[in-house]
Every structure is written in C-alpha cells, then in structure tokens.
Amino acid sequence: MTFTIKDFNVSSVNINVLCKQCQHYYSQMNSYHHGNLKKELLDCALKMCERDGYTKLSIRSLAKESNVSQTAPYRHFKTKEDLYAEVAIEGFNKIHKAISKYDSNDSKRNLIDGAKAYIKFGLKNANTYDLMFGTAIKDFTKYPMLFEAANKTYLHIRSTFKEFSKNKDDLYIEESCIDIWA
C-alpha cells in the first residue's frame, strides 16, 4: 500500500521502519536524564566548587561540566546566586549532620567532638565553607531554605555550648557562639 502526500510516496514498510527509528530516538531522549537532574547538577556544583572555587562556578560552566544543554540548569537555578544558595544549603546540612552525631550525656565531649567535626568540614570543604560564610550570597533571608539550614546548624552549636557552659547568661552564650560560628 502506498500513500501520496504532496508528491511524496511512502510505502507502509517505510513507515514502520521510520516509526521504529522514531521510537528508539524518543526513548533515548527520555532516558537521557533518567534521574533527578537537580540533584545531579547540585552534586556536580559541589564538586566544581571544591575543585575550582565558588567564584569559577557559573550556571554555564555547570551545564558544560554536567553534559547538559546550557538552558537545562536554568530550570532549577534562575541566577548564579540561586545556585550558590543551593550549594550553601548542602554545606550547612552536611555540617549539621556531622556535628549532630555527638549527643552523649557528656556535654564537654559533645562540644569537643562537634568542634572537631566542624573544623574538619571547613578544612575538607574550604571552598564551600568560603561560599557559606562569605559575601557571595547577599541576603540569606531571600532564601528561606538557606536561612533555615544555617539557623538549624547555629542553634545546634548554641545548644551544645549552652549545655557545656557553666555560665548560663544568654548574652554570654550568644557572644561565645558567634565567636565559635565565625
């Protein structure tokens, strides 16, 4: 059987072959990013941040490094600062996880082990740490999840220090924790 479309003859056999090729191409397109693209991009951004420093991290360089189209990351990060905020959130979550492991009845041990974990994170992830505590993100309150992650980490440090400290004065605790945080 043959169809004619504006002087273009196509046999039914050719249509079947063409359809199979299209299905194969379509399935490849759909499976190109079979996972969570945002997570893959964020993991890549963290690696790039550590390798090159956050000042070299851009949405364009992230797309290139991740082997995705230049527009793909923009679906998840509208601006460079949005990307920085997401990297910083991951950093604060990692610090919080590291320092939260220590929850014994010995407040001195908790403080020492938590401080070691905090310092270890900073040394191992120096560029991410610089991003988290630097000036690249102008206003943490613009990013509620970033503010929450940073605050959760700070409050854990504060609570651990308060348990350890013999001086329970709130102003003393706050000033001491700001020194620890910095």
Region roles according to the model:
Residues 1-36, 47:
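N-terminal intrinsically disordered/low-complexity leader segments
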Residues 16, 100, 141-166, 174-178:
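Amphipathic alpha-helical packing segments from all-alpha helical-bundle domains
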Residues 40, 49, 83-91, 98-99, ...:
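Alpha-helical DNA-contacting segments of helix-turn-helix folds
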Residues 40, 48-82, 86:
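Helix-turn-helix
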Residues 86, 100-127, 152, 176-180:
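Hydrophobic alpha-helical connector segments
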Residues 124-141:
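Amphipathic alpha-helical segments used for helix-helix packing
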